[in-house]
Amino acid sequence: RSEKSEGCRFMVRVMDLEELEQDALKRNIPVMQKEGILFLISQLQDMKATSCLEIGSAIGYSAMMMVTHVEGLQVETIELNDERYQEAVKNITERNLQDKITIHHDDALSFDVSQLQHAPYDCLFIDAAKAQYQKFFEKYVPFVLEKGIIIVDNLDFHGMIFDIDHIKNRNTKQLVKKIKRFKDWIFNHEDYDVEYYQIGDGICVIKRKEKE
């Protein structure tokens, strides 16, 4: 009986999170595309992850999806935007997930890393300001376990990365160039192996190269 009620609770929570996702999309709040979040969850499940550091919480959707689907997972997440942070706290608390999700209201670039509560992590998930991907990576990769993974979302930026010359908006063009620079940098980095997946808006799974 308890397994059945657990299953019911799980389904209710998943449907509830889908409603949250739809509401966020209507309000133009950036949430990870469905196929992207399911891919992320499968990566965490495959490695039996127990800890994930997320850069960019938005309204808490991806963190809640992760802890709902990955048994025993703790997510620690950092959000800069005040409104989104407040909404994330509300969403997490309403669903009684505050024992599985730790959220910090701060700029991840200036965040005091001594405040991290669950380091080292099985996974670092970067889905925040795209122009800062390399800085986020360099700051937080030391807190990823030797066999851990780094997942970076949004690397195609709506396909624009393949057609930079035709972008009219100057700011958008600068942003896409920065994403491309990060992509080139990480793909050519001698310390990391990178697998690229055309899922959602382009996802990279990055692992440290095994030492010879």
Where are the model-predicted features located?
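A short alpha-helical cap/connector motif
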Residues: 1-151, 155-212
